[in-house]
């Protein structure tokens, strides 16, 4: 994390320096006046044609005059927009279309078609659940009352879900959409309009990046100098790579967690059935853990994308397409650095979400085994307080160590639960620990004792 913080600090300083330099270049009164005249000539095509004709007729005397320079710049800007590369335009159009097509209704229809095939399996599991519950009610009448209530509620839930799977799936998808809309609600559009979703902000940024890359690629195509054309093409590739990386990562953080949550909730009834089988309850715990992890990424990713989209839109200069014509390298580095900084800040969400997920799992399932330092500490504590078989074997003697090691270190017995429901809950949460395996007994006979008579030591005075 130290290296990542240094990278973020360096990118932030570079953005600040580039922004100050770009602002200083824009605030120059001579350049501002030139930009205004270029815009006027770009709008007035007749005057621009007259100036270009006069400059071409007398290139020796009027080539370096401001009017000729402004007319050529206006003509170049007009040509750059008209001569955008078809491949780049198509690529960004496909990306924007993919963002627009990731609509909730399409996702809902796909999930409904996918899970509708599981309806016979849901009916079979529901029938098996009813039969098992009836068998338990008839064969084991000593069950506590809460056990019957829990299983009756489980049967009712699974039966209702099996009778109306489409309505259940539509409710799940609508709930996930409402949660995603509520998470992205506080973030407004850069121009002060009403609140919009994160996909709309990414679509607007994709359109802006498409215009930038088309302008740079068009200048590279129209430049007669090969060296300058290569420079323009490199600038276009830098902007396309940085903007494309930001768009892909932001879109994945917006779409993938919601899709995973919807799929897990749609398959929830199948995992609820597993609560009846003690050996399969860990699958339900794994399903709950995956659902919590996806909800954490959804709760952190959607606001982060909205916030960074607003920051990125506010940090980018307003007249960036015009600056690409006057100062392409500085404008390219400014746009690329801002996009790279936003991408790195999104990447820091992964360890943050992992730590939050680990904390939630420790709070929700305190007795479950967790990977990492917590499990290592628990294993070390168990080894510290466990009886030591080596000391007991040494006390038993060298020959009886293998035979009586198991009896010298008895295995701790499982504590008897106070009532069956407590044992059921403890086993379901993973709190009940099986006793450790007994030490393997050495059934070989002990060696015969040495009965030889040893010489006695003389009694010396």
Swiss-Prot record:
The chain crosses the membrane at residues 118-138, 232-252, 253-273, 294-314, 333-353. Residues 376-461 are annotated as: Disordered. GO terms for biological process: protein secretion by the type IV secretion system. It is found in: Cell membrane. Pfam families: TrbL. Disulfide bonds: none annotated. Keywords: Cell membrane, Membrane, Signal, Transmembrane, Transmembrane helix. This is Type IV secretion system protein PtlD homolog.
